[in-house]
């Protein structure tokens, strides 16, 4: 509700972009003169709607960071588990890259986020809410125009993937949780030996040198908010793996991923290594298991003994 419906759909090079920018500017001025603030639109309901939309579009794991940060700033009770619940309840209905076939420009041509919102409203996955246009969310969605024959947006009844965009998982590696990307693959369980790195650059070089292979679990630590510092996106490594044709591999990190990241990846491992999290205790060769169904991420090692020895 905080972004005008369809405003972000318009491609950068589309002639309509300028007019869309002007529309947004006028809406901002109107809302200011009406005495509205962002908190009118940032509510628990609107944040749950946003999480459902992220899941439906196969969106980025970064949504967990952004939505919870917005909630904290707005003083709204909304957390990681709310994001998780939304993804468990909302199937992926957009066939978008990196896991699907189409680009954001194709989504725009097919009917855009207005069409996605309409699908979610019709299936009861979102609730009505006010928007900055002055009209309700459902009123905006009702004006969706689906392009005949489009293949980008399906329906909740016939989704691209039933299991949502991402999942929050826990385990002895991530007592406070990690976020596992689900869109773009059908892996339910992965087990393999750890290949441990203390920076994205080291991991990237190892992939380029052929030191990482099929069946491995790449562990990149000290890339969290404190350790990085700044929690960088581990896009280089996932891109390098794809470029070298290495598909049967997992990657876990206390850093984060770009929305363009591809593969079986779990980020935001918490506590991070720099805060003394268990990920700091993993060694090369440790057997790591990531179980989607059980929502677990564990390592076959006595981490307590290792911590005591330090």
Model feature map: region roles:
Residues 1-310:
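Catalytic or ion-coupling anion/metal-binding cores of large enzyme and transporter domains
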